[in-house]
Amino acid sequence: GRERWLRLAATGDVAWQRAQPLLRSPVRQRLRIRISELPAGVTLRAGESALAALTDLADPAEPEYAVASRLWPKQDAPRTIPTPDTGTCVVELWRYAPEATADRGCVDPLSLNLSMGEVMDERVQLAVQSLMENISW
């Protein structure tokens, strides 16, 4: 097969910083549902669950998963739950298929960084910073 290579004028981390104003979170919507109603194909960890798998952050009380919004059932979708409860999980509906760039059962680190941008929890922000420092550009 053929391969295509992209060469950046700057190092990866510098290019990432310069691109920040042009980027947005891949998360279109966040839904809370009963974990027992989670569709079978939705297994990719996202949000704090992915951050916990990739850093020293503790697992969240509610597991978080990602799926492309176009794959989420429009009819017969699981009923949403308004507040956290025992046996619930969070499903992030993404603008694109997160599986395309996923690694080790988690969304990719750059997309994870973008999806966590509005979280104000200091321990989460420290974990995101640690994640970004460990990327080999």
Q: Each PLM stretch: what is its role?
A:
Residues 2-23:
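Short, cationic-aromatic polyanion-contact patches
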Residues 17-137:
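Long, low-complexity, charge-rich intrinsically disordered regions
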